[in-house]
Amino acid sequence: MGALSAQVKDELIKVSSTKQRSRIAELASIIRFAGSIDSALGKTVIEIELDNEAVAIRVAKEIEELFAISAKLVDLGPMATRRTPRHVVRIAEDAETLIRRVGLVTRSGHAVVGLPPQIISGSISDAEAAWRGAFLAAGQLSDPGRTSGLEVACPCLEASLALVGCARRLGLSAKPKETRGVEKVVIRDGEAVGALLSRMGAHKTRLVWDQKRARREARPLGNRLANFDDANLRRSARAAVAAAARVERAMTILGDDVPDHLAQAGQLRVQHRQASLEELGRLADPQMTKDAVAGRIRRLLHMADKKASDMGIPDTSVVVTEELLDDF
């Protein structure tokens, strides 16, 4: 488990909710994303396997406090196929009562495959709790980078879609993704990752994430301009800044008339002013070639310049001034 992931989990286990619904939502999510429910000889057993001992202790404590059901903690040491120890919360008595109380079976006894309906249609705090539980169970947060982001490994497609729905209720865009046979939910946008960390209750980690992200985004420009002998880099930086300024002007001119696919390319150019076209393509979701990015930006500027001409107002080139490019 990476340092940031561990930091998030250490912070989340200290989050306490006064709402019983939210506590149950978090527990249901943990069972769904880290648990297995098995029946043998007519007896149901739940095992929740976690990578953090403190999380396992929290889960056992919540089960006891919410439902007066005892849970046993079992530590699994490192193995040849697994270097890190695992911690299992085992419920052998009243397991059926537990899964019914958290909503993982319907009143008629049918198993719920994704998340319980009361979470999907519940309050914002329920959605936050579901994400908190999912991250404690199977979440990872990587350092800001080209493929950075927050992800949760999911037991099935239905669970991933349910988590995507919870993110949508929080105003965030998450995407289901299948990698090497494992279903995942991924959030790549840096601002969205920060917002979700705050929503879950990891406010300190959110500050660390934002600082790391800001340093990383500032570094490419500093690296490029440090070598003033490299005229190509300077020309590229000037062109990127000029294009970003023109795109901003274009978006103002076009207003709501901007097609979505052109708006996406324009927003990337504005948000990452010093990035190369190739870097913008990698930041797009889904990713694009640099030629595709360039083509969309070119069409956006052409549309805006044509509309400006029709309206009798200055076109996008008016914002490209010597003052704008003085630092390059």
Curated annotation (Swiss-Prot):
Disulfide bonds: none annotated. GO terms for molecular function: DNA binding. Residues 276-309 bind DNA. It comes from the Bacteria. Keywords: Cell cycle, Cell division, DNA-binding. GO terms for biological process: cell division; regulation of sporulation. Involved in cell division and chromosome segregation. Belongs to the WhiA family. This is Probable cell division protein WhiA. It comes from Corynebacterium diphtheriae (strain ATCC 700971 / NCTC 13129 / Biotype gravis).
